[in-house]
UniProtKB/Swiss-Prot annotation:
Ligand binding (S-adenosyl-L-methionine): 74, 95, 123-124
SUPFAM superfamilies linked: S-adenosyl-L-methionine-dependent methyltransferases
Gene, per the UniProt record: ubiE
Keywords attached to this entry: Menaquinone biosynthesis, Methyltransferase, S-adenosyl-L-methionine, Transferase, Ubiquinone biosynthesis
Organism: Marinomonas sp. (strain MWYL1)
Name of the molecule in the record: Ubiquinone/menaquinone biosynthesis C-methyltransferase UbiE
Amino acid sequence: MQDDQKKTTDFGFKEIPTDEKVKAVAQVFHSVAAKYDIMNDLMSGGIHRLWKRHTISQSGVRAGNCVLDIAGGTGDLTVKFSRLVGSEGQVILADINDSMLKVGRDKLANQGIVGNVKFVQANAEALPFPDDTFDCITIAFGLRNVTDKSKALASMYRVLKPGGRLLVLEFSKPESELLSQVYDQYSFRLLPAMGKLIANDADSYRYLAESIRMHPDQETLKGMMDEVGFERTSYQNLTGGIVALHKGFKF
């Protein structure tokens, strides 16, 4: 957990001044934005689409709801949510990175999804929305890049309606030692090489692999959600714990 007085924080395996992390992460995503979707498909063999589909199925979102998709990037979840909430509902795709927002906005416009979706550049630690606004909040593969994760979770709790739920889809800790070893080899050898080949950027993908290892494990993240007020918190391991879906409610 981050402390307001802490002067340094992790950036992958490096320690950098806390006030520099937002800029450093922004540079990574400015670099990868244009190739983000194709790299996701290549890196996961397309499995990320199944993880996201499962997240949607656990959201409870229905017609007329108001949904916040934090770190929504290129809009994979927003596309699905826009269809679920219909013309009477709204989805806000929020991302701190304007390059990712532009890719997401263009992608959705090309699919004709414009009426019930709004794009907002926002920091998850200080969400610019009133209290008790959203029926559901999701953050998929974004929380590990946030500097102060507890502050971000508290901000999400504040803007969630009573009765609403938060879903956090994120890389986590594999359940078996063998899977962990195989995953390490893939992450630190193959992933940067793919980044270099496809996006001409090995360093950004090396950071993404390192950031996964620095992210809190399943039980730690569940505890962090409990601490800021979420109730009935739980998590489900997907693909052997390579990814976990955390769920929490506000009552």
